[in-house]
């Protein structure tokens, strides 16, 4: 058996094909795993565990079924869903992990993280990140009316899109020195992360000559992306394209016993 990792699905009501692709992944790939790790930006935005969107209930039910069937699920928050809390995690049957988590698979320690903290050249974003991760600010935000929270989230998303469109792509990728420093700080040689939407397996050497590996998950825009870790190593896998709209409609009708 293997351990599976995914990130950057950006699930939303506006992208039903991505949701359908994820549900297919839960039905076909995830049940065969020893565990599933979701490394952030699972949802396109998250304004609180009390948001009653039908999508949130649907996803929670599917993850709970996976967990109830014996596949543990773990979650690290991303820059889009860092407000996802214990209440929703409990509904999903998944365990919340800190921003940086070391796990050991087949005798090898691996550092897991979303990946945004590695993009240290993007100083504007890092300043923004420090602000929105302020516990007091988060406490206040969660107590605002749901409609106001949504309005703020939409405005911040639009501002982020405008800001990113003016930035060089290199600024929004990881800084290699930060990568090496993070590995040294944790005393490991392997990491798995998402965030950059640039799926790849990067092999490089640390300052002391030891070999290191940085495995990067892809986004789920048109098809799924996962990393599989088994006894043979770390594998980056591209999943099939998401179901077409007519397939999604047929699946919904079947689930409602209308076809």
Curated annotation (Swiss-Prot):
UniProt cofactor(s): Mn(2+)
Membrane topology category: Peripheral membrane protein
UniProt entry keywords in alphabetical sequence: Cell inner membrane, Cell membrane, Hydrolase, Lipid A biosynthesis, Lipid biosynthesis, Lipid metabolism, Manganese, Membrane, Metal-binding
Location in the cell: Cell inner membrane
Reactions this protein catalyses: UDP-2-N,3-O-bis[(3R)-3-hydroxytetradecanoyl]-alpha-D-glucosamine + H2O = 2-N,3-O-bis[(3R)-3-hydroxytetradecanoyl]-alpha-D-glucosaminyl 1-phosphate + UMP + 2 H(+)
Domain of life: Bacteria
Transmembrane segments: none
Positions annotated to bind Mn(2+) 1: 8, 10, 41, 197
HAMAP family on file: LpxH (MF_00575)
Protein name (record): UDP-2,3-diacylglucosamine hydrolase
Organism (species): Edwardsiella ictaluri (strain 93-146)
Recorded name of the encoding gene: lpxH
């Amino acid at each position: 058996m293997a351990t599976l990792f995914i990130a950057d699905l950006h699930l939303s009501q506006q992208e039903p094909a991505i949701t359908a692709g994820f549900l297919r992944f839960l039905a076909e790939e995830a049940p065969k795993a020893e565990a599933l790790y979701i490394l952030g930006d699972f949802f396109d935005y998250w304004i609180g565990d009390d948001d009653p969107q039908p999508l949130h209930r649907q996803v929670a039910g599917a993850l709970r079924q996976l967990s109830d069937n014996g596949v543990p699920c773990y979650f690290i928050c991303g820059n889009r869903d860092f407000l996802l809390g214990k209440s929703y995690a409990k509904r999903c049957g998944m365990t919340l992990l800190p921003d940086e988590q070391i796990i050991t698979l087949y005798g090898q320690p691996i550092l897991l993280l979303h990946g945004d903290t590695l993009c240290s050249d993007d100083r504007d974003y890092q300043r923004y990140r420090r602000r929105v991760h302020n516990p007091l600010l988060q406490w206040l935000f969660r107590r605002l009316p749901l409609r106001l929270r949504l309005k703020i989230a939409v405005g911040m998303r639009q501002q982020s899109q405008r800001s990113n469109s003016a930035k060089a792509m290199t600024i929004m990728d990881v800084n290699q020195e930060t990568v090496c420093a993070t590995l040294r700080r944790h005393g490991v040689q392997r990491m798995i992360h998402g965030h950059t939407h640039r799926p790849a397996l990067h092999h490089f050497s640390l300052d002391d000559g030891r070999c290191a590996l940085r495995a990067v998950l892809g986004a789920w825009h048109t098809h799924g992306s996962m990393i599989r870790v088994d006894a043979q190593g770390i594998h980056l896998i591209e999943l099939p394209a998401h179901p077409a709209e007519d397939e999604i409609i047929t699946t919904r009708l079947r689930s409602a016993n209308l076809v």
